[in-house]
Design a protein with these regions (language model features):
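Short, electropositive alpha-helical surface patch
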Residues: 76-84, 121-124, 169-181
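A short alpha-helix capping/helix-coil boundary motif
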Residues: 58-61, 125-128, 153-156
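Short beta->alpha connector loops
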Residues: 97-102, 126, 164-168
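Secondary-structure boundary elements
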Residues: 87, 153-154, 181
């Protein structure tokens, strides 16, 4: 058996999200509210810490994914980041976010503290508030944009995930040009 079996673990640390993306499985397409089956919760730090204590030394990447919520909604996100990156074997922490939470100072501080050990994946689907809102309803575009720009001024690894829809495809070229800056 290979020693490389457990190199990446994805933690869903929160089911809270301020966005009302109509095609997200957590959102009722008609109302924009969370589905009735969704139980809003944050993973406890004690549980995460216990799991981290049990992870193998072959673990290289931890991801905080936004499958049912945005990790940045977690009130203890900073503690989670610090704990994840305290494990010597961890080379990268990947965080998916719509970007509309926290503030530029938080992202700058994480960049200064951890640099390229963090990969932030910002889900911003337009270059204007109106375009982004068509899918990511509930997300403050200006805040998301400012947070992404603040991150880009540090050594954080950054990816802009721009989902293409019929209402934003015409912005792809301009978005690509902005991403190069």
């Amino acid at each position: 058996m290979s020693n490389n079996i457990q190199q990446h673990i994805d933690f869903s640390i929160s089911t809270y999200c301020q966005a009302k993306c109509r095609s997200c499985q957590r959102t009722n397409q008609d109302t924009g509210e969370p589905e009735d089956w969704l139980i809003p919760s944050h993973m406890s730090y004690d549980l995460f810490n216990s799991m981290m204590d049990k992870t193998p030394d072959t673990l290289r990447v931890i991801q905080f994914c936004g499958e049912l919520g945005d990790p940045m909604m977690h009130p203890d996100i900073t503690k989670f980041v610090d704990r994840a990156l305290s494990k010597e074997s961890i080379k990268h922490l990947v965080i998916n976010t719509n970007g509309g939470l926290r503030n530029p100072e938080w992202y700058t501080n994480m960049g200064l503290k951890y640099g390229s050990k963090i990969l932030l994946q910002f889900g911003i689907d337009g270059i204007t508030h109106d375009t982004n809102w068509k899918y990511r309803e509930g997300v403050d575009f200006a805040k998301a944009w400012d947070n992404m720009i603040a991150s880009s001024k540090t050594d954080i690894d950054l990816e802009w995930h721009f989902l293409i829809f019929k209402w934003n495809w015409q912005e792809v070229t301009e978005a690509a040009n902005l991403a190069k800056k």
